[in-house]
């Protein structure tokens, strides 16, 4: 079936979004054109501005329109002494929603993966080391993903912290709240057993 070249271009562009295949892109394109052209225009303007104006924080590397993000500029967080290392800006959002962390962050934008040719310099570990050597940091909390690559990255950073006498800790991994043991995979259950906590009375 012949369709408009512009429509084809729109559907192809929408496929760059994660989880969007040809059918989903087609539905989105027709929805915008048939029922929500004003929404489509707002989306286009927001995308154009975001792509051209959002960069990376000079300190933690998260997304921001300024040279430094609001978290890094917060005096209370600067005095906290803790840095939480995460793989992506989305991880910061998830941790901030808990309200349990009051320090600053460092975003790797990935993890170590020798098989893919991703080394320490590719995920900004030279910048992290500079912070470790120049700032008053009391603890580095390693919140990389519980994968082989995430664990390897955490171990590498942990050794780096040791060179500067800085405490490094790894976030706990285990059985999710409300989960049933029979539904938990073996690796997660192993982590839960190894990282068990004493009951305090």
Curated annotation (Swiss-Prot):
Q: Where are the zinc fingers (C4-type)?
A: 57-72
Any Pfam family from its record, for instance, is: RecR_ZnF
Every Toprim domain range: 81-176
Q: Which UniProt keywords apply?
A: DNA damage, DNA recombination, DNA repair, Metal-binding, Zinc, Zinc-finger
Q: What does this protein do?
A: May play a role in DNA repair. It seems to be involved in an RecBC-independent recombinational process of DNA repair. It may act with RecF and RecO.
NCBIfam families xref list: recR
The protein's name is: Recombination protein RecR
Organism equals Yersinia pestis
């Amino acid at each position: 079936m012949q369709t408009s070249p512009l429509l084809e271009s729109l559907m192809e562009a929408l496929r760059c979004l994660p989880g969007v295949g040809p059918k989903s892109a087609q539905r989105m394109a027709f929805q915008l054109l048939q029922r929500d052209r004003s929404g489509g225009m707002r989306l286009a303007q927001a995308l154009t501005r975001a792509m051209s104006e959002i960069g990376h924080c000079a300190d933690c590397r998260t997304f921001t329109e300024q040279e430094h993000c609001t978290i890094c500029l917060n005096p209370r967080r600067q005095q906290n002494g803790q840095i939480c290392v995460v793989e992506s800006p989305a991880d910061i959002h998830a941790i901030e929603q808990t309200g349990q962390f009051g320090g600053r962050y460092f975003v790797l934008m990935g993890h170590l993966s020798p098989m893919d040719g991703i080394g320490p310099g590719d995920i900004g570990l030279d910048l992290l080391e500079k912070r470790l050597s120049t700032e008053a940091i009391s603890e580095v909390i390693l919140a990389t993903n519980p994968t082989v690559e995430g664990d390897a990255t955490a171990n590498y950073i942990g050794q780096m912290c040791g060179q500067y006498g800085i405490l490094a800790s790894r976030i706990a991994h285990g059985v999710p709240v409300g989960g049933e043991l029979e539904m938990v995979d073996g690796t997660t259950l192993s982590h839960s057993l190894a990282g068990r906590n004493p009951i305090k009375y």
